[in-house]
């Protein structure tokens, strides 16, 4: 007996209806990116591991899918190394490539490699899949699409403002109510300074970024495990639990971080971004959230995250400023900021809230019934005119029984069927049937087109 086929955990197949929904998401995001002057690029699915490793922190590096070298990859490995059973060390010997973890690091690599061809500031967008060796669960997949927009070659905070406008516009078009959360890595660095743990900034941010998932008690336990003193943890509590309006939070931070030049710079940047956005009249809520600490090594300024308000799911968009990212590829002094829409989670949110527009998921609008070669030839001439008018139409390929053809149309949710028999051909017309109401009318091809366009 043949083995039952399956797909890897954390991956999915998509039906035609699901693909129509996904394309609605991609096209909506793409249209908004174009409105703001972004241009599209693509990069390979696989990158050199030297490009990927060390860019996402220790936790991120563990989630990289590594690609085994072809050929006799054991030839350069000693018996001693094999017997050591050190998986990380062995992997470095026979894996030189990996699947991309996100689109930001490959983009930084692209900028460095193509610097002489790029006009700066460079506004690029990219819609491609990424892979993470994560534990699959609701809303978390091992293969998923990201829809990134980044600006490199400009320090201006107007870039952050525009990216938040893009987020607001996209989710307004989707009719998804969201909260846009913003923080600044400099504020987090300032907090680490004033509690006397400046050298533990990465440990602190990785821990407090988990606050929503594991709770305050477990965050504090993790901080203690990392060697952060009880006194420092106590000082941290009122800061990360700070409440009030954005203006009130900023006022408190100005007082708390007064002794930290880095922290005050972060407050200044956040104040500019939030103040400018306030004059733009965003449709969605924006919140300064000090627990937002996106545990990635490359963010250096503003950081963003977007949560859906009407459904329980993780972050559906995130991003931030990464001033030093291209430096690791030999191109210093290039500042960048970007956002990434999680298309797969947005897909789930739109499904749960039933927010897909009917026209976005409709496929064939009109099907011609096939009674035989002569009728099919007549229908094909009408079909050409219908398609030229931009109507999605098809003809049933076989002269099957009427019941089978109608069942096919119903299964595909085709709203109209055109019936062409001998009588219709004699009049040069078709019988147009509304599949929802059952109403039938004898129409010319021009009348048929007009009926479907109305």
Swiss-Prot record:
The keyword Transport does not apply. The keyword RNA-binding does not apply. It comes from the Bacteria. Transmembrane segments: none annotated. It is an enzyme of class 6 (ligase). It catalyses: tRNA(His) + L-histidine + ATP = L-histidyl-tRNA(His) + AMP + diphosphate + H(+). PROSITE patterns: AA_TRNA_LIGASE_II. InterPro entries: aa-tRNA-synth_II, aa-tRNA-synth_II/BPL/LPL, Anticodon-bd, Anticodon-bd_dom_sf, His-tRNA-ligase, HisRS-like_core, HisRS/HisZ, HisRS_anticodon. It is found in: Cytoplasm. CDD domains: HisRS-like_core, HisRS_anticodon. Its EC number is 6.1.1.21. GO terms for biological process: histidyl-tRNA aminoacylation. Keywords: Aminoacyl-tRNA synthetase, ATP-binding, Cytoplasm, Ligase, Nucleotide-binding, Protein biosynthesis. GO terms for cellular component: cytoplasm. GO terms for molecular function: ATP binding; histidine-tRNA ligase activity. Signal peptide: none annotated. Pfam families: HGTP_anticodon, tRNA-synt_His. PANTHER family: HISTIDINE--TRNA LIGASE (PTHR11476:SF7), HISTIDYL-TRNA SYNTHETASE (PTHR11476). NCBIfam families: hisS (TIGR00442). Belongs to the class-II aminoacyl-tRNA synthetase family. Homodimer. This is Histidine--tRNA ligase. It comes from Bacteroides thetaiotaomicron (strain ATCC 29148 / DSM 2079 / JCM 5827 / CCUG 10774 / NCTC 10582 / VPI-5482 / E50). The lineage of its organism: Bacteria, Pseudomonadati, Bacteroidota, Bacteroidia, Bacteroidales.
